[in-house]
């Protein structure tokens, strides 16, 4: 059974429990550090007088940091170990989140978002490596364990949804508390959540250190990682990065422009997070069955549908459906690439494979927010166009990027294993 304690690789704890606690790394690195900014974008833009292009560039800067962090992670893991890098990254991400509340200068905020991106890449990649190692202990349920880790981002999303709108509403948009705007206090509250989660991560990180020295000779029949072998999947994942981040950055701003109340936004974002947490159960079988790019392609198609819905209508049931489907799919796309690597590579090459996919993922995220922000701003000079019209056009672009990614991923074949 998955719930029983196992001794494989020196572990004495339940793989399920370890994956669950490791999921707090995904909560910190993506659920809060990356995605909570979408909740803070509207009040920060209103208070600081930003354009949508500048607002989008904050997540572009975060993605640039993530890109650099992804390049650094294999080097760090060779000198430390995945578990230590994860905890250090989580604590640093918490620090940089907190510092964001002290600045109003856009340059300084861009720097803080960049630093948080570097640290969050360390956390997310190393957590993915550890979750993949756990999956190797129970191959029949590896998709479940990997999906559980990535679904942890939903914990961060849900907590952010419950915390940020409530705090902003309590403090008021026009008033400052002890000299700081309401959004600054929201940054500090989110940083506190990250600190708590980071401290909880210490125990599972210690428990999993034996896995990082486990022999992988039994998997020597797998091929080594080569970029050319995964070209279509890497292209598909790049377009996923371009498309999904536009939604996560600007959908709250679109809902605000469409007249959604603070309570409606809280419900929408919380349901998105809950769906994300539940998604590991829904897609585990798909990830386990397919060794090709089929899972990545299927999930990108569904994600494109969820992304385009709020751009086509502001009907509340449809908007809620969009959030639930998006939350139930988007991090399973990430898990699908990890599963693809596990199916086709030896454990020795998992870190290299995960890092390569993370790099192209980050590259896509660098492009996405600025393009969507530019599209939203470019609608302003058009007669009769509103901010909502511009943001809707941006989400249509995001959906198209996701569908293009699905087309690429559908061409990815499973690798022929070495004898």
Region roles according to the model:
Residues 84-98, 294-309:
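Structural signature of the two symmetry-related core transmembrane helices
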Residues 69-81, 279-291, 376-377:
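Helix-to-loop junctions at the C-terminal end of transmembrane segments
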Residues 37-38, 229-270, 274-277:
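Extracytoplasmic gate region of multi-pass secondary transporters
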Residues 96, 107-115, 317-325:
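Paired small-residue
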Residues 112-152:
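Cytoplasmic helix-loop-helix junction between adjacent transmembrane helices
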Residues 49, 81, 102-108, 291, ...:
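Helix-breaking motifs and short loop linkers at transmembrane-helix boundaries and internal kinks
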Residues 106-108, 141-206:
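Helix-loop-helix hairpin linking two adjacent transmembrane segments in secondary transporters
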Residues 344-381:
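A late C-terminal transmembrane helix in Major Facilitator Superfamily
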């Amino acid at each position: 059974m998955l719930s029983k304690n196992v001794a494989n690789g020196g572990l004495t704890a339940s793989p399920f429990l370890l994956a669950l606690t490791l999921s707090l790394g995904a909560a910190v690195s993506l659920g809060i550090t990356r995605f909570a900014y979408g909740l803070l974008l509207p009040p920060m833009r209103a208070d600081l007088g930003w354009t949508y292009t500048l607002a989008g560039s904050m997540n572009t800067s975060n993605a640039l940091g993530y890109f650099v962090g992804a390049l650094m992670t294999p080097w760090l893991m060779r000198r430390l170990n995945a578990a230590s890098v994860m905890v250090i990254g989580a604590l640093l991400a918490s620090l940089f989140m907190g510092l964001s509340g002290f600045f109003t200068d856009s340059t300084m905020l861009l720097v803080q978002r960049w630093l948080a991106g570097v640290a969050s890449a360390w956390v997310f990649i190393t957590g993915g490596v550890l979750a993949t190692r756990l999956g190797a202990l129970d191959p029949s349920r590896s998709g479940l364990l990997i999906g559980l880790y990535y679904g942890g981002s939903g914990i961060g999303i849900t907590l952010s949804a419950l915390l940020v709108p409530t705090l902003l509403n309590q403090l008021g948009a026009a008033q400052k508390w002890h000299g700081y705007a309401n959004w600054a206090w929201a940054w500090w509250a989110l940083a506190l959540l990250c600190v708590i989660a980071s401290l909880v991560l210490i125990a599972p990180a210690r428990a999993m250190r034996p896995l990082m020295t486990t022999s992988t000779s039994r998997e020597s029949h797998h091929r080594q990682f080569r970029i050319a072998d995964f070209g279509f999947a890497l292209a598909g994942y790049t377009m996923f990065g371009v498309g999904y981040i536009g939604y996560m950055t600007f959908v709250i701003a679109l809902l605000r422009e469409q007249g959604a109340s603070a309570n409606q936004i809280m419900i929408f974002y919380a349901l998105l997070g809950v769906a994300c947490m539940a998604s590991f159960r829904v897609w585990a079988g798909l990830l386990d069955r397919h060794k090709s790019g089929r899972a990545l392609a299927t999930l990108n198609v569904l994600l494109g549908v969820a992304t385009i819905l709020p751009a086509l209508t502001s009907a509340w049931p449809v908007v809620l459906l969009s959030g639930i489907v998006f939350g139930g799919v988007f991090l399973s796309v990430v898990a699908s690439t990890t599963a693809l690597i596990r199916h086709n590579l030896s454990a020795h090459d998992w870190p290299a494979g995960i890092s390569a996919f993370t790099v192209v993922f980050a590259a896509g995220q660098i492009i996405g927010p600025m393009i969507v922000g530019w599209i939203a701003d470019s609608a302003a000079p058009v007669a009769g166009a509103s901010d909502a019209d511009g943001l809707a056009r941006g989400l249509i672009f995001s959906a198209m990027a996701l569908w293009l990614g699905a087309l690429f991923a559908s061409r990815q074949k499973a690798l022929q294993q070495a004898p």
